[in-house]
Every structure is written in structure tokens, then in C-alpha cells.
Amino acid sequence: MQQHLSKTAYVYSDKLLQYRFHDQHPFNQMRLKLTTELLLNANLLSPEQIVQPRIATDDELMLIHKYDYVEAIKHASHGIISEDEAMKYGLNDEENGQFKHMHRHSATIVGGALTLADLIMSGKALNGCHLGGGLHHAQPGRASGFCIYNDIAITAQYLAKEYNQRVLIIDTDAHHGDGTQWSFYADNHVTTYSIHETGKFLFPGSGHYTERGEDIGYGHTVNVPLEPYTEDSSFLECFKLTVEPVVKSFKPDIILSVNGVDIHYRDPLTHLNCTLHSLYEIPYFVKYLADTYTNGKIIMFGGGGYNIWRVVPRAWSHVFLSLIDQPIQSGYLPLEWINKWKHYSSELLPKRWEDRLNDYTYVPRTKEISEKNKKLALHIASWYESTRQ
């Protein structure tokens, strides 16, 4: 299969669904299967584009993670970790609880990203899509925010070390990409850009615009924190004002894009007020940046997104569609997909690609929120330009 790849490689295997903490946990990889089947049923994804993830080696994991942490994850995989050790490594709560074979399943997510990196760097694919990845909260020595191994950071370091690539990470998840940021805070070969809901009210509490890197990494960390209840127009305006100057100045060889879709107003864990309009526009703009500045080299990841029935499948489908230069979809979803999954869904499935917006609430403070966001975005853009002079 991998000898006859089209320009876009799409990572999928049912093995990726095994990254699962417990049945009631908000992080549910069934969203990946729902998205993949939607794309297949709509004849937008072909089986020839699908590649299998490999399992990342310990040495690859330790490009970012500490040896003792990787060993602790292995112990937790078999239920032989002490309570003190679990607490030390962030594995003792509902957020990042232990599950069987967690090391292997987590390393498979990382391996999926590295598979794409090798395909792109060998010229067998131009770009890649790994919606099962995007675990941006994992720290070098601690699990965090539903994330065990940080596949994004590992892939960035792998590309930098193995292929001498300058890597730009663009993260549009509602939560700040803290694990990725801190992994490269003093690095000038990897630049991290994150636009997110302000940490004043949302996990992980970081991502202030004054977090800008240190030592040779100063100016290689860019954060754009937005106010709660930010709507589409403000999110997209601030994103475009701040991200292209970073790409243009840093001159990356490749972009890693984190496409959390929890900025949607229906997401149960966040407070932003965006719709599918933003979630459809964002990946297409990032694809434009890759086409313009990196000769099209880009890997698009998944990320957050906890309304797995009404939001994630349609939004993530467009992450892939942006890579294959297909237009934004409209009209009815495939009946085959609806008829299969309506028996499993906890809520009424959408019938169309578009949001109905029948339950959308317009916030009275929209103007004030947008003005505050724009003022900050302009300040960040001005600061960034000054660091490049």
C-alpha cells in the first residue's frame, strides 16, 4: 500500500482506538473512527491513502520524554506501579488514569506521526493527516491533560534531529499546547505558536502572551490567548493577524498543525463560541501557509474535541479535505453513515455538513470581546515583528 501513495497519507488503524482511559472518560477515540468512516462513506478518502502506524521505539520516545517516565508508563501498562510513583508521573487521577497496554497504545500514536514524517521526508508523500494524534499536554516527565506521550513534540524533534528541519508547530486547540511549548522553550530550531482560550479560566492555565521562550529560544514561542465566548470572526481575525508573520519570518521547512476542534460552541469542556465556519476555515488557511512557505510540507494532527457526534467528524473531515485540495462541503451527509451511527449516538446526529445553529447563543459582549482580542493580537504581531529586526 505504501508504495503507491498519493500525495496525502492518512494514518488510521483500529489499534489507535485502544488509547482509552475508561468508558466515561471525555477523551474518546471513537471520534477517529467516526471521522474516517464519514470520509470513506462520502467517497472523499480512498483506502489507498490510508497508512498503518508503527510503534515508536523507546529511543524515539526519549527524544522528548525522560527515561524514568517511559519506564513508569511501561509499569503502569501492567498494573505494577506504586501509588507514589503514579502520583509522581501524573497517573493517579481520573484525568490520566492507567489502562492496560497504555505504553504500546500511546507509542502507536507517536509512531503514526513518525510514519508520516518519514514518508514526507523520503518524498513518498507531500503531506499527511494523523487525526488520532495531537497529544500536546504531555510533559517530558509527566502525563497531563489526557496525554501520555507528546507525539507532536517528538515528531518535531525527530524532524529536527534526523532531517535537519526547521519545524513550526501551529496549535489552534482551545487549550494551550503547554507540553509542546515547554519542550522547546529554549530551542531555536522549533517554533511553537498557540492560539487558545485564555488560561485564566481554562486548563492548563498557561499560554500567556508574555511566555515567549528563553535564551536562544526567545521569540520562538508565540501565544495568542483569547477571551471566553470569542466568536468566529474574532478568532479568525486574530489567527490571521498573528500566524502568518511567524511563518514568514521563521521560514520553517515543515509545519505541524494541531487541529483541536474544541473551540466549537457545543464542546462541553471549553468556553469559546465558534462554529464549524472557523473549524472549516482554519485548516485551509494553514494549508495555504504550507503551500506558500514550506513547499506544501505539513502534517496535520487532531487534538481536543469532546462532542464526538455532532462536531468532531465534520470538522476533522475538513482537516483532511484541506490537504487534498477538496472544497468545503455542503449539503447532506451520507445516509450510510447516519444510519449506522444513529443507533450508537447519545444525541441526534447532524444531517448536513453545515451547522444548524438552532442552539447557538449570541453573547451580548461580543463587540467588547472582539475589540480586546484584536488589541492583544496587534500587540503580539508588533512584538514579534520587533524581535525579527
UniProtKB/Swiss-Prot annotation:
Keywords: Acetoin catabolism. The keyword Iron-sulfur does not apply. InterPro entries: AcuC, HDAC_PDAC, His_deacetylse, His_deacetylse_dom, His_deacetylse_dom_sf, Ureohydrolase_dom_sf. Pfam families: Hist_deacetyl. Pathway: Ketone degradation; acetoin degradation. GO terms for molecular function: histone deacetylase activity. Transmembrane segments: none annotated. One of its GO terms (biological process) is acetoin catabolic process. PANTHER family: HISTONE DEACETYLASE HDAC1, HISTONE DEACETYLASE HDAC1-RELATED. Belongs to the histone deacetylase family. Role in growth on acetoin or butanediol. Involved in the breakdown of these compounds used as a carbon source. This is Acetoin utilization protein AcuC. It comes from Staphylococcus aureus (strain MRSA252).
